[in-house]
Structures are given as C-alpha cells and as structure tokens.
Design a protein with these regions (language model features):
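DNA-recognition alpha helix
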Residues: 27-37, 60-66
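The DNA-contacting recognition helix of HTH DNA-binding domains
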Residues: 26, 39, 67, 81-84
Length: 112
C-alpha cells in the first residue's frame, strides 16, 4: 500500500446514510441510471474511495432518478434534487450538518 492510497480513502460518505434513509440499494441506482454506471462505482462512492467529479455526478444523477421514480406525482413537486456536494464529503462546497429539505418525504417513501 502506497502513501497516496490513504489520501483517496475518505471513509463512509453521506451518500451511504442517505441511501439507507431512502431505502435504496446499489442495484436501485444502477438500474435507474440512464448512463453507464456500475455497482462497483456506486459501492466505491458509498465507502469513500475518491471518485472523479464526472463519476460523482453520475452517481448523484442516478440517486436523484431512483428517488424520483419512487415518488407520487404530488410528491415530485416538493422534491429537492441533491447536488453532488451533499453526497460526498470531499467534494468542493460540502457542508456538514445541513438540514435535509426532503426529510418528510423520506419517511413517506420508506413507509411504502
């Protein structure tokens, strides 16, 4: 193991907790993605292995689409799409402790 590998491992990401809160699996994101996204990329993103900006954005789009597909029409109107800097703590503009505007929707969707 070289010295740089520790710099690329950022530990569990907010994405991991948010996927659990929404009741999503890696497969849900891969299935929802219109792009070429694979299970390995999603897993690396969840566990904190540093992704390129392009891959972070792919994962972010798949995450938002997977949630969107579970929402009813009236819920879609209030859904706040997550930017990548809410999902990865090493991305530029990340702020810990943000209040999630979708907390109410999470409970409704998980209850189904």
């Amino acid at each position: 193991m070289d010295d740089t590998s520790g710099e690329r491992d950022h530990g569990l990401q907010p994405l991991d907790a948010m996927m659990e809160q929404w009741g999503l699996s890696n497969h849900d994101l891969v299935e929802a993605s219109p792009e070429q996204l694979n299970h390995k990329q999603v897993q690396k993103g969840r566990k904190g292995r540093q992704l390129t900006l392009h891959t972070m954005q792919k994962v972010m789009r798949a995450f938002n689409i997977a949630i969107w597909n579970r929402l009813k029409k009236e819920e879609k109107e209030t859904f706040f799409e997550y930017p990548h800097n809410w999902l990865f703590n090493y991305s530029k503009g990340y702020e810990a402790g943000r209040v999630d505007p979708n907390d109410g929707l999470k409970e409704v969707v998980r209850g189904r």
